[in-house]
Amino acid sequence: MRGLILDPLGKIVELPIKSNFREGLSIFEYVASARGSRKGLTDSALKTANAGYLTRRLVDVSHDVIIRGEDCGTKSGIIVFKEDGERTSPFHDRILGRVAASNVVSKKNKKVIVKEGEEIEETKAKAIEENEVTEVTVRSALTCVMEYGICAACYGWDFSTKRRVNLGVPVGVMAAQSIGEPGTQLTMRVRHFGGVVMSDVTQGLPRVEELFEMRTPKNLSPVSDISGKVEIEKTDDGYLLKVKNLRVKPPEEREYFIPLATELMVHDQDVVSAGTQLAQGYLDPKDILKIKGIVEAQKYIIAEAQKVYESQGIGINDKHFEVILRKMSDKVIIETVGDTALIPGDFITKVKFEEINAEILSQGGEPATARQIQLGITKSSLFSDSWLSAASFQETTKVLTEAVLQGQEDRLVGLKENVIIGRLIPVSSDGEDPQELLQSERVLSTGTDTSPDKTSIEQQASDNV
């Protein structure tokens, strides 16, 4: 018995298929089954392209994340919790191969299991679980302070060798392919179900895309902008939620309308904090960023993306998501310009912003101010520091025109820009330091004439003859 079937639009056909193929189907069941099978075939053909395109965008945003040093020296990290919402992957797997950002102390006897700066290998990961440790602070790509790329300590193990990652490994491309490739697998797996109603994976892939592009989700749930007491008023169309904070002067009040069909997650007279989810549905990462800050927004995106993959039994290490999110979060938006030549509302990388401010401060001027933002992968690629990489991705004419007008220079730190101009890419597979490939003269500027002179071209032509 095949059960309920999806029609070509993805809606459920109300009458299920009760017969089996041995006994034979009725006319209605046969037509419904054929439509379901056709949907499966067309889905796998069309949606494979979507998964491939997602991989391309992920590679484009992260190709310049390469291991550039052994240790950046940062003291910060991220906290990995044993009980982490709806995560199904074991605690052991989430801390294995990471570097501890602070001492991990046993809950039983207060002994130090892992010292700060040590790798959490198999025996230590087991000891952490046995000693009832509920949270571990580990180094992360999100908190690495390397100017370009990331350091080996913040990345941790390369799981192909089960030891610390070598210098020069292109971890950005590895992360993009680790996330994108299962997307292709998921999409192609739809065909095997032949339109039978179940958790259709093609609903999962658009969800991952939605998260990485920082889009406002369709099934949006409001979050409280302020802390305060909830008052719920039922109307004909839905619920009117009021959050009031009477402790401040003047008192604050926010109103939210929630449709009747949506399940509420708070009760009348509940006290909520800023950022509390008020109803069932997805949150907008931009709201979390505004209310709770960049760290909470990053945690939400990782948790939601992992939920999609883990529901299909696909295990992807968190560090791959962290590498992509590092690139999504490396821009700032200019608020005040000071004595710089920047424009309010411009997007600029943190590295470039700090360089410009340092130069202005050295001259005794007033620095610019900015706030950190999180961009979707497409937008982040287009606002890359490398105009060669951005132009080879999308909107080529626009990117090149702006690069010429601003006299931008390209430091050639990523893979794409070096491939385009025919140089060696700044990576190494055997642990050799790729820094020699990143010398200061390797800067390609749109403001200078880099074309060969006429005599050298004529000489080359005569040599070929």
Indicate residue ranges for each PLM-predicted region.
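Intrinsically disordered, low-complexity regulatory segments
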Residues: 1-465
